[in-house]
Amino acid sequence: MAQTWKDTDISLDPIKDQTIAVIGYGIQGDAQANNMKDSGLNVIIGLKEGGNSWKKAEADGHKVMSVADATKQADIIHILIPDMIQGQVYKDEIGPNLSEGKALSFSHAAAIYWKWIEAPNNVDLIMIAPKGPGSKVRETYLDNFGTPAIVAVEQDFTGKAWDRTLGIAKAIGSARAGLIKTAFKEEVETDWFGEQADLCGGAASMVTNAFETLVEAGYQPEIAYFEVLHELKLIVDMIQRYGINGMWRRVSETARYGGLTRGPMVMDSANKENMKKVLTMIQDGTFNNEWISEYQKNGKDAFDKYMKQYDEHQIEKVGKEMRKMMWPDSTE
């Protein structure tokens, strides 16, 4: 069984006198910085000078400065900027100002695992990864609960890396919901696999194929959209709350029998073999090398040729109209 911690297992005392620099003030940076501040920690914000987030962070009551200055002043540098710029920001501003005994902290371990950042051996390397978006991290904290997180220590130079890791996890509220111990390697590989095979890639492809199957058989696109896309959230919510078996016990008998007997026909052993291939391409570095190459050549335009497939697909054209019915104030 995985090692776990609850809020009562952890003390903030080991990091009460330390300064934590949150690098970045996007969705996660905003939420985690404010939660830590509200928990009584000494938080500073490191940002690109003149960036859009500077004024917002100041308005929220934070002391804001350049990334370089924040790195100099902090004991723990908690890096929450987008993955693909972490390497360059580290090279330009963090690395030159990093000194012995500090900690580099992340909410996703890819930059260290794939050596986009080559950290020295005289600092701690830690990770606190809330399993939810920043908005939920803040919302659950304000509700006196939290968003569960997975935590890891890759390098414990000071002998106090776990105190730092668990302290931050407690301060952002995640320990209230529960913490699970992982490793940088495990977090990166499982996170990317989930995104590609299931949560984003697999789910989007499954829904699109189901929509096409109904429309090609002569059914109205609007009805197909409701049946295979809109209602998906109802099922996912049940699975998240009650588990897969709990979902089966809460749907109709017809849905239960049909799903139990036909589901394996749709997601068969061939699909599982393809999932194994996706996992192997993550594990052996194939995906990382492909992604880095694409990003270096094309930047964010690397998405365009793939996004265009969905932009022009009938499911999106129908979906925009259907969503207007349910969310008339929505601006997509």
Curated annotation (Swiss-Prot):
Binds 2 magnesium ions per subunit. Substrate binds at S252. Pfam families: KARI_C, KARI_N. Keywords: Amino-acid biosynthesis, Branched-chain amino acid biosynthesis, Magnesium, Metal-binding, NADP, Oxidoreductase. GO terms for molecular function: ketol-acid reductoisomerase activity; magnesium ion binding; NADP binding. Coiled coil: none annotated. Mg(2+) 2 binds at D191, E227, E231. It catalyses: (2R)-2,3-dihydroxy-3-methylbutanoate + NADP(+) = (2S)-2-acetolactate + NADPH + H(+); (2R,3R)-2,3-dihydroxy-3-methylpentanoate + NADP(+) = (S)-2-ethyl-2-hydroxy-3-oxobutanoate + NADPH + H(+). GO terms for biological process: isoleucine biosynthetic process; L-valine biosynthetic process. Its cofactor is Mg(2+). NADP(+) binds at Y25, G26, I27, Q28, K48, S53, D83, M84, I85, Q86, G134. Its EC number is 1.1.1.86. Residues 1-182 form the KARI N-terminal Rossmann domain. Involved in the biosynthesis of branched-chain amino acids (BCAA). Catalyzes an alkyl-migration followed by a ketol-acid reduction of (S)-2-acetolactate (S2AL) to yield (R)-2,3-dihydroxy-isovalerate. In the isomerase reaction, S2AL is rearranged via a Mg-dependent methyl migration to produce 3-hydroxy-3-methyl-2-ketobutyrate (HMKB). In the reductase reaction, this 2-ketoacid undergoes a metal-dependent reduction by NADPH to yield (R)-2,3-dihydroxy-isovalerate. This is Ketol-acid reductoisomerase (NADP(+)). It comes from Nitrosopumilus maritimus (strain SCM1).
